[in-house]
Amino acid sequence: MRLNTLSPAAGSKSAAKRVGRGIGSGTGKTCGRGHKGQKSRSGGGVRIGFEGGQMPLKIRLPKFGFTSRKAMVSAEVRISELAKVNGDVVDLSTLKDANLVTRNIQFAKIVLSGTIERPVTVKGLKVTKGARAAIEAAGGKIEE
């Protein structure tokens, strides 16, 4: 072992650099902030997206789109999740009881993702073509 081969242990963390502790430390006096200016001051700095008073890009570009209110009360349920439903009938209330959708959901759609082993009867839910084929192949049925 020699002095030039010594190194910190693997995974160890070096101590935080202490600023304002003299010229020899490398971060004395101005503490790495330079001279004057907004960024050198306490609490200095500009908000995200600020462009120095120029009209920001976010405001220069036109508005577009909207948030569908129906999307907030709609949900998709995977076909593999239907195994968590107790009983043979799957409707909105049984999906809520099985915690597959939240209480505020009013519309649900069953999509093909995964597999289903047992036959179930789907009532009052939308079903994709692939999910419909998989449910019927497992011996289940869909009632509108």
Curated annotation (Swiss-Prot):
One of its GO terms (molecular function) is rRNA binding. One of its GO terms (biological process) is translation. Residues 21-31 have a biased composition (Gly residues). SUPFAM superfamilies: Ribosomal proteins L15p and L18e. Keywords: Ribonucleoprotein, Ribosomal protein, RNA-binding, rRNA-binding. InterPro entries: Ribosomal_uL15, Ribosomal_uL15/eL18, Ribosomal_uL15/eL18_sf, Ribosomal_uL15_bac-type, Ribosomal_uL15_CS. One of its GO terms (cellular component) is cytosolic large ribosomal subunit. Part of the 50S ribosomal subunit. Belongs to the universal ribosomal protein uL15 family. HAMAP family: Ribosomal_uL15. Binds to the 23S rRNA. This is Large ribosomal subunit protein uL15.
